[in-house]
């Protein structure tokens, strides 16, 4: 190994002090911060929130201090349909209801994974991966579908937010304490030679404790409820005796098996035209597995535009923290000028960022519009976020087309939009990716 010598450091000092621009930038950045000093005027001008195709102006939602973006994005696609179908002024489905059942199911999923890996050492990478974070707030499209299909949905008025759903840190801390403790109990029980019936009985006993903890923290979810509302014409509507499943069937009425996940992961280990899944990724035991079809980025954008032209918004996953201005609501590759400002070259491409852990899916949002040029090519995209209405334009963001190319990884579209060849590839036996693959990262936040 080569040490850093004083002579080398002296050389760096001299080079820095010889560049008069650096002194000005040092003053600007130390007083204002990197982003404020390097923010470009050009990016704000080019990414105004005006779009040739704009599907909704509904009020945005707010996930607050939680990692429920994937749920919010899915429920937002549903509520847009409901607002239009039932002529509502505004409406939200309960994100907390889906959150409760996700925590419950993830706990069982984790314990089943612990049982399945009981023959491996605690130091094995898979067991260590499980124990590092037994569960968290994140998830994937197929995971939220599994929850909707099993538990339905309810209006937010029926099961509102709690402190622990809006700010989930305490909940996650103590739920993970319980799960790690339960993992030890089950592994030690299995080490004694206990049969599966005994192990499952113990697991059910542990799940009762977890269920009690969740119910006390989030509130006990309703089994039946009434739903009343007034439409835009002030007509009153009410219905009683609903269950979460019957409410979903009557008021949402989407066939979720008609939707598929399409990704753009341009790395050497993931050839296009193949389907993929991620080992140990899921929540509901016995439900559909997480599955993606990998396609080139141009095809992914073409599919998203086709769905929006048909009048339907698009759930999508991206790395939202990359070159973004949260306050202004701008996602653009040129929002900050590091090259002119600091002589820093950020040239790593999308594949390189994935391979070297610089980028991964961190956030799910909804595409609700796009600005197309005369030839039908996208210039910028309208993004419905779930960070409240104090950021962006009333909570909506603008993503430049270049930003979409570099930092968008997944969309969910109707499978009827796929070609016969693409659909066959999606339905083929998927290639299994490692549990820590970046294509599973959205579920790890």
Regions found by a protein language model. Give the residues of each.
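Short helix/strand-bridging catalytic loops that position acidic/His residues to coordinate divalent metals
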Residues: 54-58, 350-352, 384
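Catalytic nucleophile-His microenvironment captured as a short glycine-rich beta-strand/loop
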Residues: 69, 148, 355-388
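Bimodal feature
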Residues: 2-22, 72-75, 88, 400, ...
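N-terminal regions that are enriched for targeting/export leaders
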Residues: 2-58
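Conserved catalytic-core surface of thiol
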Residues: 373, 379-445
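Long, positively charged binding patches that form subdomain-scale interaction surfaces
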Residues: 287-362
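Active-site nucleophile-adjacent alpha helix/oxyanion-hole segment immediately C-terminal to the catalytic cysteine
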Residues: 44-314, 391-394, 401, 409
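Short His-Asn-centered micro-motif
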Residues: 72, 316-319, 368
């Amino acid at each position: 190994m080569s040490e850093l010598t004083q002579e080398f450091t002296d050389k760096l000092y001299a080079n820095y002090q010889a560049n008069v621009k650096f002194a000005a930038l040092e003053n600007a950045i130390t007083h204002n911060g990197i982003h404020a000093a390097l923010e470009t005027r050009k990016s704000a001008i080019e990414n105004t929130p005006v779009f040739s195709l704009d599907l909704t102006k509904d009020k945005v939602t707010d996930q607050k201090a939680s990692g429920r973006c994937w749920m919010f994005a899915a429920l937002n696609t549903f509520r847009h349909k409901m607002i239009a179908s039932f002529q509502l002024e505004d409406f939200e489905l309960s994100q907390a209801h889906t959150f409760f059942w996700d925590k419950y199911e993830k706990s069982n999923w984790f314990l089943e994974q612990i049982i399945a890996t009981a023959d491996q050492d605690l130091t094995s990478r898979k067991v260590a991966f499980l124990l590092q974070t037994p569960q968290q707030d994140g998830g994937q499209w197929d995971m939220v579908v599994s929850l909707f299909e099993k538990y339905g949905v309810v209006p937010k008025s029926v099961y509102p937010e709690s402190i622990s759903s809006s700010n989930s840190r305490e909940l996650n801390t103590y739920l993970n304490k319980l799960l790690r403790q339960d993992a030890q109990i089950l592994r030690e029980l299995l080490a004694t030679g206990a049969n599966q019936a005994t192990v499952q009985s113990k697991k059910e006993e542990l799940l009762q404790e977890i269920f009690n903890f969740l119910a006390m923290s989030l509130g006990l979810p309703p089994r039946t409820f009434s739903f009343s509302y007034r439409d835009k014409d002030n007509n009153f509507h009410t219905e009683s005796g609903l269950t979460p499943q019957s409410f979903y069937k009557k008021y949402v009425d989407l066939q979720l098996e008609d939707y598929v996940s399409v990704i753009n992961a341009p790395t050497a280990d993931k050839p296009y035209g193949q389907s993929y899944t991620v080992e140990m990724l899921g929540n509901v035991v016995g439900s559909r597995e997480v599955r993606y079809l990998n396609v080139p980025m141009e095809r992914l954008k073409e599919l998203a535009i086709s769905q929006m032209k048909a009048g339907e918004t698009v759930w999508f996953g991206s790395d939202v923290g990359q070159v973004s201005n949260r306050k202004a609501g701008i996602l653009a590759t040129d929002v900050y000028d590091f090259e002119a400002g600091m002589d820093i070259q950020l040239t790593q491409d999308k594949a390189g960022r994935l391979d070297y852990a610089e980028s991964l899916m961190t956030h799910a949002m909804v595409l609700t519009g796009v600005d197309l040029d005369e030839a039908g090519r996208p210039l910028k995209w309208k993004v419905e976020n779930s960070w409240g209405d104090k950021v962006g334009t009333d909570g909506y963001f603008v993503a430049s087309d270049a930003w979409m190319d570099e930092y968008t990884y997944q969309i969910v579209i109707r499978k009827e939009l796929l070609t016969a060849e693409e659909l066959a590839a999606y339905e083929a036996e998927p290639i299994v990716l490692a549990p820590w693959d970046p294509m599973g990262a959205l579920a790890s936040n």
